[in-house]
């Protein structure tokens, strides 16, 4: 008899959704400086678009300041332009091969907008988790229909898949609440 559904594989896929969510919310700017803020920035370099961290070193020298050290002097202008055009509301100050980026205080409107974006990311992750759950439930129904597992085993595994889904979604909610608190903190 087959086991019906690979719970480890479902857990791995659900954990992937959590990892993607953590990465998404890490790029949201809060009151404190973080190199992750510049993750979405891509630079036109050497004939293609590259992530900023592949053409420069990003550090956090102060609580409200980022420092970007561009490796190739000819790329400084492109890096500055990419940061300005990134819709992050940042204005880099060029200092030789370095760019200093002061992070402005977030106003209430911008904070609420960031919280909304965080909620969108959370919803996207929850949908991904529910798709994984649906795939698992479909596999269980097929295994039961094909006679690979009995009705009782199918029901038991179905409950395990549901519990796993509930746990992952509550973890996403917890991460969202933490990020929301961090964003709204003045």
Curated annotation (Swiss-Prot):
Function in brief: Responsible for the release of ribosomes from messenger RNA at the termination of protein biosynthesis. May increase the efficiency of translation by recycling ribosomes from one round of translation to another.
Annotated stretches, region: Disordered: 135-164
Keywords carried by this UniProt record: Cytoplasm, Protein biosynthesis
Gene Ontology BP terms: cytoplasmic translational termination
Pfam families recorded: RRF
Compartments in which it is found: Cytoplasm
Family of this protein: Belongs to the RRF family.
GO molecular function terms listed in the Swiss-Prot or TrEMBL record: ribosomal large subunit binding
Gene Ontology cellular-component terms listed: cytosol
Protein name as annotated: Ribosome-recycling factor
Domain of life: Bacteria
């Amino acid at each position: 008899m087959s086991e019906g559904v690979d719970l480890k594989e479902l857990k791995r896929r659900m954990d992937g959704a959590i990892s993607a969510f953590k990465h998404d919310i890490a790029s949201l700017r809060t009151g404190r400086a973080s190199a992750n803020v510049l993750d979405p920035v891509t630079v036109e370099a050497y004939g293609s678009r590259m992530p900023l961290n592949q053409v420069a070193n990003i550090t956090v020298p102060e609580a409200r300041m980022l420092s970007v050290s561009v490796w190739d002097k000819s790329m400084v202008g492109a890096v500055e332009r990419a940061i300005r055009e990134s819709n992050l509301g940042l204005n880099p100050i060029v200092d030789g091969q370095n760019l200093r980026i002061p992070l402005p205080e977030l106003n209430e409107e911008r904070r609420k907008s960031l919280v909304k974006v965080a909620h969108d990311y959370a919803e996207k992750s929850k949908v991904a988790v529910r798709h994984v759950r649906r795939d698992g439930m479909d596999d269980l129904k097929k295994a039961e229909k094909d006679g690979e597992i009995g009705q009782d085993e199918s029901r038991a595994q179905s409950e395990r898949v549901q519990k796993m889904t509930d746990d992952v979604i509550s973890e996403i909610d917890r991460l969202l609440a933490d990020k929301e608190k961090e964003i709204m903190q003045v």
